[in-house]
């Protein structure tokens, strides 16, 4: 198992720690139609977001290694002389941006800041289905959540499984539910 933590794994961990565990163990969920659609529209959607945000320039599909984080940012937009990561989601923008989306954006902020050696305070999430953009600012509580998730994922990558905490609303349509159903349930405190 690699000790490099991808921002997508952070998003997954905060949504469901067990799903992140299975992914880290080498059992990723097979691509869904939505995942495939997201890959197909990514470049076009990133270009639309760059234009809408008035980016001076944009770099697409930028791979960054900034231990313990690594991954590919959909785009790095240069706005007012500063780099900002852009994450493209195929879905419509939700009424409230989920915390796991914000934490993924925060991870991209940390990666871009380290890779470019410039202060980065903002990331953007482009929701392609609705054509809306969410601006995510790095705040102290978001940084603390990112640090917590990275710490827990490092433990998972070293072989320590998370505590199972079933959520019927999430588990009902989860591809991994067949593996979790036999595990004992307890509540993990953050």
Swiss-Prot record:
Disulfide bridges in this chain: none
Reactions catalysed, as given in the entry: exonucleolytic cleavage in the 5'- to 3'-direction to yield nucleoside 3'-phosphates
Cofactor: record remark: Mg(2+) or Mn(2+) required for ssDNA cleavage activity. Can also utilise Cu(2+).
Upregulation: Slightly induced by 20 J/m2 ultraviolet light. Member of the csa1-cas1/2-cas4 operon.
Keyword Transport part of the UniProt annotation: no
Entry cofactors: Mg(2+); Mn(2+); Cu(2+); [4Fe-4S] cluster
Catalytic EC class: hydrolase
EC numbers on record: 3.1.12.1
Gene3D superfamilies membership: 3.90.320.10
Domain of life: Archaea
Binding positions ([4Fe-4S] cluster): 16, 171, 174, 180
Keyword annotations of the record: 4Fe-4S, Antiviral defense, Exonuclease, Hydrolase, Iron, Iron-sulfur, Manganese, Metal-binding, Nuclease
Record-stated family: Belongs to the CRISPR-associated exonuclease Cas4 family.
Protein name: CRISPR-associated exonuclease Cas4
Species annotation: Thermoproteus tenax (strain ATCC 35583 / DSM 2078 / JCM 9277 / NBRC 100435 / Kra 1)
Lineage, highest ranks first: Archaea, Thermoproteota, Thermoprotei, Thermoproteales, Thermoproteaceae
């Amino acid at each position: 198992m690699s000790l490099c933590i991808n921002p997508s794994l952070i998003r997954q961990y905060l949504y469901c720690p067990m799903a992140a565990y299975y992914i880290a163990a080498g059992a990723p969920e097979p691509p869904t139609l939505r995942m495939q659609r997201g890959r197909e529209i990514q470049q076009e959607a990133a270009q639309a977001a760059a234009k809408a945000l008035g980016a001076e320039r944009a770099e697409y599909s930028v791979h960054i290694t900034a231990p313990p984080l690594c991954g590919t940012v959909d785009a790095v937009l240069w706005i007012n002389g500063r780099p900002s990561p852009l994450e493209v989601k195929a879905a419509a923008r939700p009424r409230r941006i989920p915390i796991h989306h914000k934490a993924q954006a925060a991870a991209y902020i940390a990666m871009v800041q380290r890779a470019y050696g410039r202060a980065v305070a903002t990331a953007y999430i482009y929701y392609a289905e609705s054509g809306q953009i969410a601006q995510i600012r790095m705040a102290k509580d978001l940084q603390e959540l990112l640090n917590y998730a990275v710490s827990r994922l490092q433990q998972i990558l070293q072989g320590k499984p998370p505590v199972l905490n079933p959520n019927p609303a999430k588990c009902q349509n989860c591809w991994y539910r067949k593996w979790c159903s036999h595990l004992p349930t307890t509540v993990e405190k953050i």
